[in-house]
């Protein structure tokens, strides 16, 4: 049967092992390894053992698509864990749903991960273990308005990231609803390292604070 080789059941790990978000993938793999070890030690699968087959997304959506195809077609895994980046989960989702193989993302928060934005139909083989962008954006807007007491916001996002776009959208909607004003919106690209000119432009708009829904490398 698919994913079963004798006494071994193969699970796919579609993870960011290299690239800009490698910290997510590496820590995720460590967690999966530990979980599989404990499951195997308990012997809850009737004597069968789980093994992890990893495909590296290289922190790129296109590579996630290739990796999903490999895990399903070549490695014959029974299910896939990952990726962590929303853009990568969305890109690879058509493959696992088409093949009727379950995928679960630990960190893919964009609503489009589990719901087709065009048809509004739930993707039957895509799942997540985390909250979603509407929740995060709403909470951040509430925190900015009610706790920080700020009125003028700048939004600075990674223009290549569905994660960043989703958070920015829901933050803006709720911040404005709370009586705030978004005075400027700017964007950077993944792997950018020089932000001085844009930050100078943002400073000139005189925001009370800057909302940057991005990944750790560029934000740091």
Model segments located where?
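Loop/turn elements at helix/coil->beta-strand transitions in domains of secreted/extracellular proteins
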Residues: 7-10, 47-51, 74-79, 98-103, ...
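Short, polar/charged alpha-helical segment
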Residues: 23-45, 169-176
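Short beta-strand segments enriched in small/hydrophobic residues
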Residues: 7-27, 83-84, 152-158
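Short, intrinsically disordered, charge-balanced linker/junction segments flanking boundaries
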Residues: 208-220
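Short, low-complexity disordered leader/linker segments with a strong preference
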Residues: 1-10, 41
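Beta-alpha junction/loop-to-helix N-cap segments that form part of ligand/metal-binding clefts
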Residues: 23-28, 42-116, 188-195, 217-220
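An alpha-beta-alpha
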Residues: 17, 121-190, 209
